[in-house]
């Protein structure tokens, strides 16, 4: 173990092993955090030089097999079948890390694959038949009339889907066109040429042991080089985060805002199922000061997706998003759906919520950001996959034209210059004030004024508010524990409500135990002085997978990282009040393996 002060400490962290929770020893440096924090690249620790990476060359390298990345790949081959295109996916399979509601606006798929409705085997099996909006109180609910909702909130013509299955279907389309897709390979490093332009990415090394040294099964990562590189990692992607910082892509933009979305998939009794029903709600249990909402989506085969979103600009460090979700299911208007049912799956993922004014500059030398890496979610609609598809198509069209003109590794500024004139710009511009109004004025007045603002944008094409600012980051929004009261949450009953560890088991999450911890604490002393002593350890609550614990050892509080439980939601990277936790990819193919999510 490499420790700057030669004082390693051992702490023990539970890991998931089949259906058992065993305990794995992790070694930390006293007062400094995980030893692996000082070894972001194994080459820094190894006494022996690592072998050179092998490389492969393509016209376009795409990071992330989500809706944006796969749509970009398909579009590139549609425009020019001779282009060589590769897609890297860190999940064990395409769709393994995809988590969404999801009610999909098909406009993006219509543009990409116009004849998809005539095909057999497409994943759009359940069209929305009923659209409901509920305001929940502690004991009752009020259904808001549909005629009062802005037209853009209407879900008729949309489809309830598993977005993971949509991505699997898109991957088949891409491969049929000649796209190479490599699941199980995490893009761990951006590669640059001598002029500082992006020329591709390198996959992570495999077989690095937890001390940072190459083990017996060590395999060097691969370089994938391209004339252009598209980053479609999803929300808070590790490479996108680096590129935004390196090229100052967030300059003159509002800070990005986020939510944490937690979802379960249930098999319910036939009498409790209404295929095509979409039900959105807000209010209880979050109250009127904390932003968020919830959904029930009735899919095919008597399955129901239930989800809960908490805006991550909440102030109270004692708030526990997972427990708020469990409480939500006990509401009289909600619990009946699940009586006699069985929970099938569980997962969680951060959501971009900053909208129009938080979208970073998309282009950089050698490539561009697409999809949720750029933040194209329409917050009030709770939809972003249609914009992800369109962004992938836009980027593909511009890169295909650039390559045809003999260009390579320059900045495709046309992507940045034109996205606001596409359907994405229209979609985000008209809802740009909903999130800041909600954040500043609360669920009651904020939501009402946000609805009014959507109506004025719909009818007159303008907003009385102009373009509002978000202000603080989500990390800065958290207040010291002394300013708040603890929240008592009921114990789970194991039938309708559950604990985190039994929930994580249903995500099929797995990580090799003998590897460096992929959740890096930059300063362990700061974590104790501030995160614990000032904020009462919010990481133990905001994480939906129980990754973080403060445990007493030898009379001292020690920060324990149960990295094996991580579902890759990225909440810690976003909400830690000191930005002291950094999420980096573990070995490729690890993390959750979501099915039908």
Tell what function each PLM region has.
Residues 533-563, 571-594:
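Iron-sulfur cluster-binding cysteine motifs and their immediate structural context
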Residues 69:
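N-terminal Rossmann-fold NAD(P) dinucleotide-binding loop
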Residues 65-66, 163:
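Glycine-rich Rossmann-fold phosphate-binding loop(s) that bind the pyrophosphate
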Residues 348-379, 503-514, 527-542, 549:
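FAD-binding beta-loop-beta segment adjacent to the flavin cofactor pocket
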Residues 90-140:
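N-terminal FAD cofactor-binding segment of flavoenzymes
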Residues 164, 168, 173-336, 375, ...:
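Predominantly flavin-linked oxidoreductase catalytic cores and closely associated redox partners
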Residues 23-60, 75-84, 527-529, 533, ...:
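Extreme N-terminal leader/targeting segments of oxidoreductases
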Residues 375-381, 393, 397-442, 560-562, ...:
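Active-site-proximal substrate-binding core of FAD-dependent oxidoreductases
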């Amino acid at each position: 173990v490499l420790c700057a002060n030669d004082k390693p400490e051992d702490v023990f962290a539970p890991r998931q092993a089949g259906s058992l929770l065993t305990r794995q020893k992790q070694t930390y440096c006293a007062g400094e955090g995980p030893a692996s924090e000082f070894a972001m690249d194994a080459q820094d620790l190894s006494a022996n030089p690592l072998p050179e990476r092998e490389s492969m060359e393509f016209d376009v390298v795409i990071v992330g097999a989500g809706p944006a990345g796969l749509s970009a790949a398909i579009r590139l081959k549609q425009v020019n079948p001779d282009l060589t295109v590769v897609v890297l996916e860190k999940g064990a399979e395409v769709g393994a890390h995809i988590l969404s509601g999801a009610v999909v606006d098909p406009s993006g798929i219509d543009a990409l694959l116009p004849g998809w409705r005539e095909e057999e085997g497409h994943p759009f099996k359940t069209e929305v038949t009923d659209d409901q909006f509920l305001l929940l109180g502690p004991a009752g609910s009020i259904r808001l009339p549909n005629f009062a909702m802005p037209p853009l909130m209407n879900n008729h013509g949309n489809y309830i889907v598993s977005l993971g299955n949509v991505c699997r279907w898109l991957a088949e389309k891409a491969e049929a066109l000649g796209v190479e897709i490599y699941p199980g390979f995490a893009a761990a490093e951006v590669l640059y040429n001598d002029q500082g332009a992006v020329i591709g990415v390198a996959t992570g090394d495999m077989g690095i042991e937890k001390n940072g040294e190459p083990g017996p099964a060590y395999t060097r990562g691969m370089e994938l080089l391209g004339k252009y590189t598209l980053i479609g990692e999803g929300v808070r992607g590790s490479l996108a985060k680096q590129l935004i910082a390196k090229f100052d892509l967030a300059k003159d933009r509002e800070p990005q805002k986020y939510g944490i979305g937690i979802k379960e998939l249930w098999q319910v009794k036939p009498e409790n199922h209404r295929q095509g029903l979409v039900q959105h709600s807000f209010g209880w249990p979050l109250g009127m000061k904390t932003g968020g909402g919830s959904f029930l989506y009735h899919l095919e085969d008597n399955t129901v997706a239930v989800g809960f979103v908490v805006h991550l600009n909440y102030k109270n460090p004692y708030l526990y998003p997972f427990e708020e979700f469990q409480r939500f299911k006990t509401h009289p208007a909600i619990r009946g759906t699940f009586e006699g049912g069985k929970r099938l799956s569980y997962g969680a993922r951060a959501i971009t919520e900053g909208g129009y004014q938080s979208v970073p500059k998309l282009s950089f030398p050698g490539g561009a950001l697409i999809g949720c890496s750029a933040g194209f979610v329409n917050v009030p609609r709770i939809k972003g996959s249609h914009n992800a598809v369109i962004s992938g198509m836009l980027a593909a069209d511009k890169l295909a034209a650039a390559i045809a003109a003999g260009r390579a590794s320059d900045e495709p500024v046309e992507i940045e210059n034109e996205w606001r004139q596409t359907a994405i710009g229209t979609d985000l511009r008209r809802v740009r004030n909903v999130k800041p109004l909600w954040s500043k004025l609360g669920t009651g007045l904020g939501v009402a004024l946000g609805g009014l603002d959507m109506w004025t944008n719909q009818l007159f094409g303008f907003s009385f508010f102009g373009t509002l600012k978000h202000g603080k980051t989500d990390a800065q929004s958290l207040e010291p524990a002394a300013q708040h009261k603890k929240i008592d949450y009921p114990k789970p009953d194991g039938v309708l409500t559950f604990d985190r560890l039994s929930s994580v088991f249903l995500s099929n999450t797995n990580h090799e135990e003998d590897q460096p911890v992929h959740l890096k604490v930059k300063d362990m002393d700061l974590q104790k002085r501030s995160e614990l002593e000032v904020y009462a350890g919010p990481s133990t609550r905001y994480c939906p997978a129980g990754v973080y614990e403060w445990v007493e050892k030898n009379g001292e509080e020690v920060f324990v990282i149960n990295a094996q439980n991580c579902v890759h939601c990225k909440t810690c990277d976003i909400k830690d009040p000191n930005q002291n936790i950094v999420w980096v990819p573990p070995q490729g193919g690890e993390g959750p393996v979501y099915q039908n999510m």
